[in-house]
């Protein structure tokens, strides 16, 4: 059986090795707090551009907001200029995050076309310079998130993990897909095993963790030290509690009832409104509500109605109306 245990990342001790992955547009403060309540051992923030912080882009402040209830929390920076990355790391070090993560895995074209994210998988030398300068600039632990490679012709996760370790990173997270795969197809867990066998720093496996059984299978196949959960948490912050319960008791928790799902959606919505105001908060909760209700009877019809909601009261009324039709 896989192992849920404490994990040491530099000078930071995680109570367990279940980690909420950084997801742009998903892992904002309200969602992170919900995952923390369900037992996540580490929360990763949405990625933020080092250049955006440098140029004082007003949209970055929400991305940098941390609540003391979250800790430990990992702040993820992306960029491809070693000087800017290290300078921004110094500027933000006093903020209450525990770990600084460097994004070398984002596959989104506008990020890659700027030489950032997974574009750095094609430039290991530059990647090493970024890690080294950033790790030297701050006292907080620095980690790196990478992919299997840029494409199937350039699979270099082992090389990148070596470089990360030699450059001062204290852990590496490996997504078992190439950049060209984006999020399609099956994650290659064997590349995680290869990285684990090649480096001495903790290796965190990422890709296709949807259940406790997946954690067991990944640990057995790869020997990885931690488990990073991404899409498995979308609409399902309970996944952390479900996995922890299974490892503690050997039994699966029952799936939340639709009433419990509804209460979570409404609570999540209230948190979004408090954090971002009604206009933005309601628009943010729409996608979450679609994920929460996915798989239920009439969920596709409900999704269309969710997207028309403009206020919290409308959202609450909608779920009161449809409750009986969904189960």
Question: Would you name each region that the model predicts?
Answer:
Residues 18-22, 43-45, 73-77, 100, ...:
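Hydrophobic faces of well-ordered beta-strands that scaffold small-molecule active sites
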Residues 23, 48-50, 78-80, 105-107, ...:
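Active-site beta-loop-alpha junctions enriched in small/polar residues
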Residues 7-19, 51-72, 106, 110-114, ...:
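N-terminal small/glycine-rich loop or linker at the start of catalytic domains
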């Amino acid at each position: 059986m896989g192992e849920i245990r404490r994990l040491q990342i530099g000078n930071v001790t995680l109570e367990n090795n279940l980690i909420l992955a950084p997801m742009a547009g998903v892992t904002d403060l309200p969602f992170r707090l919900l995952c923390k309540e369900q037992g996540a051992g580490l929360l990763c923030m949405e990625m933020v551009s080092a250049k955006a912080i440098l140029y004082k882009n007003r949209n970055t402040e929400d991305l940098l907001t941390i609540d003391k209830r979250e800790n430990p929390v990992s702040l993820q920076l992306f960029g491809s200029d070693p000087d800017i990355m290290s300078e921004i790391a110094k500027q933000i070090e006093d903020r209450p995050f525990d770990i600084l993560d460097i994004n070398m895995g984002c596959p989104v074209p506008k990020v890659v076309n700027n030489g950032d994210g997974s574009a750095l998988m094609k430039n290991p030398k530059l990647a090493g310079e970024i890690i080294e300068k950033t790790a030297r600039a701050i006292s907080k632990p620095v980690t790196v998130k990478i992919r299997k490679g840029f494409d199937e012709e350039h699979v270099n996760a082992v090389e990148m993990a070596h470089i990360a370790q030699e450059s001062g990173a204290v852990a590496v997270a490996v997504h078992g897909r190439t950049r060209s795969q984006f999020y399609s197809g099956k994650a290659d867990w064997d590349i995680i095993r290869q990285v684990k066998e090649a480096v001495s720093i903790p290796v965190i496996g990422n890709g296709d963790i949807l259940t406790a059984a997946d954690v067991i299978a990944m640990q057995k196949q790869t020997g990885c030290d931690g488990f990073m959960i991404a899409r498995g948490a979308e609409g399902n912050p309970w996944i952390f509690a479900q996995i922890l319960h299974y490892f503690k008791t050997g039994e699966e928790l029952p799936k939340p009832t639709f009433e419990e799902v509804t209460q979570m959606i409404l609570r999540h919505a209230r948190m979004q409104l408090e954090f971002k105001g009604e206009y933005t908060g309601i628009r943010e909760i729409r996608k979450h509500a679609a994920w929460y209700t996915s798989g239920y009877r009439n969920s596709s019809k409900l999704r269309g109605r969710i997207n028309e909601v403009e206020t919290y009261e409308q959202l609450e009324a909608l779920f009161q109306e449809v409750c009986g039709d969904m189960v």
